[in-house]
Amino acid sequence: MTRTNKWTEREGKADPKYFSHTGNYGESPNHIKKQGSGKGNWGKPGDEIDDLIDNGEIPPVFKKDRRGSNLQSHEQKFENVQKE
């Protein structure tokens, strides 16, 4: 009888139970169901402020748009200097 490899040997160690038995396949083990929106998916704390801003009931205090770049004005300054 020839010697064969044991069928019980595994090539690598199995994942710990923390990773293999919690959550759905492909999710991180510390994944929060519904991204923390709560029971019934009512939303996260602070979501109502976005709704009020979108409806125009309050001014956009928390939703400041990013300030535009001054790149175009600088290009014009450099062009004027180089042309002279």
UniProtKB/Swiss-Prot annotation:
GO terms for cellular component: cytoplasm; mitochondrion. The modification Phosphoserine is found at S28, S69. It comes from the Eukaryota. Found to stabilize, together with STF1, a complex of intrinsic ATPase inhibitor INH1 and proton-translocating ATPase (F(1)F(0)-ATPase) in mitochondrial membranes. Binds to the F0 part and may function to hold the ATPase inhibitor or STF1 on the F1 subunit. Also acts as a hydrophilins that enhances dry stress tolerance. Cell viability after desiccation and rehydration is due to the antioxidant capacity of the protein, which reduces the number of apoptotic cells during stress conditions by minimising the accumulation of reactive oxygen species (ROS) in the cells. Residues 1-84 are annotated as: Disordered. The gene is STF2. Belongs to the STF2 family. Present with 5330 molecules/cell in log phase SD medium. It is found in: Mitochondrion; Cytoplasm. It comes from Saccharomyces cerevisiae (strain ATCC 204508 / S288c). Residues 1-18, 74-84 have a biased composition (Basic and acidic residues). This is ATPase-stabilizing factor 15 kDa protein.
